[in-house]
C-alpha cells in the first residue's frame, strides 16, 4: 500500500483503483492524450516497474520491430515481473498499432484472461476501445480535467 499524503491529487483515485484490483490481473489506465510524464509519475507512485516497450524493445530493432509478434508484449511483461513488482507497460500501443483491430482485441483478451504474477498496468490513449468486456472492471479513465496541465517543455519532451 502506498502512502497517500505525498502523491499528487490526480494520483489519489488511481492508487485507490489499483488497491481494489486483484493482485494478478491486467488492467488499463486510459489517458486523454499522450502524457509520458504522467505515466512515469504514476509508475513511481504505484511503486511499479516502468517499462517503455517502444524505447527498450522496438527502437533497438529499427525497421525490424515491425516483425515482432504481439506475444513480445506478454514476454516482456512476464520477464519484468520476475522482480516482484507490478509492471507499467508504457508505449505498448506503439506495438499494438502494427496490428489490425482484431489483432489488438485478441492480445487484450489474452492479457485479460491470464493469471499474471503481478498486475500488468497498461497506459492507453488510442486503443482503449479495443479492450474486451472482461477487462472493463479493471479500467480507470482519466479526463483532462483530472490531470495537471501540460507545459510546452513537457509537450516537446513527449516528441522525443
What do these predicted regions represent?
Residues 1-50:
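Glycine-rich P-loop/Walker A and Walker A-like loops and their local beta1-loop-alpha1 context
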Residues 10-13, 73, 104-107:
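Amphipathic coiled-coil/heptad-repeat helices and related helical stalk/stem segments
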Residues 20-21, 78-84, 111-117:
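Conserved catalytic network of the ASCE P-loop NTPase/AAA+ motor domain
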Residues 34-38, 56-60, 92-100, 127-130:
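Short acidic, S/G/P-rich loop/turn micro-motifs used as interaction or catalytic elements
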Residues 50-59, 120-124:
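A generic structural motif
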Residues 55-79:
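Short glycine-rich substrate-engagement loop in P-loop NTPases that contacts/grips substrate
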Residues 86-90, 121:
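Structural motif
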Amino acid at each position: 500500500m502506498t502512502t497517500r499524503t505525498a502523491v499528487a491529487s490526480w494520483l489519489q483515485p488511481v492508487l485507490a483503483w489499483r488497491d481494489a484490483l486483484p493482485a494478478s490481473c491486467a488492467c488499463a489506465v486510459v489517458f486523454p492524450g499522450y502524457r509520458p510524464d504522467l505515466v512515469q509519475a504514476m509508475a513511481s507512485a504505484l511503486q511499479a516497474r516502468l517499462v517503455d516497450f517502444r524505447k527498450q524493445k522496438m527502437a533497438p530493432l529499427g525497421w525490424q520491430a515491425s516483425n515482432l509478434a504481439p506475444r513480445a508484449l506478454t514476454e516482456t511483461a512476464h520477464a519484468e515481473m520476475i522482480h516482484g513488482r507490478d509492471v507499467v507497460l508504457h508505449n505498448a500501443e506503439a506495438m499494438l498499432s502494427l496490428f489490425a483491430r482484431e489483432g489488438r482485441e485478441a492480445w487484450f483478451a489474452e492479457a485479460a484472461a491470464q493469471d499474471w504474477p503481478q498486475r500488468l498496468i497498461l497506459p492507453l490513449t488510442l486503443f482503449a476501445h479495443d479492450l474486451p468486456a472482461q477487462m472493463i472492471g479493471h479500467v480507470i479513465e482519466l479526463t483532462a480535467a483530472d490531470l495537471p496541465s501540460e507545459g510546452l517543455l513537457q509537450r516537446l519532451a513527449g516528441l522525443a
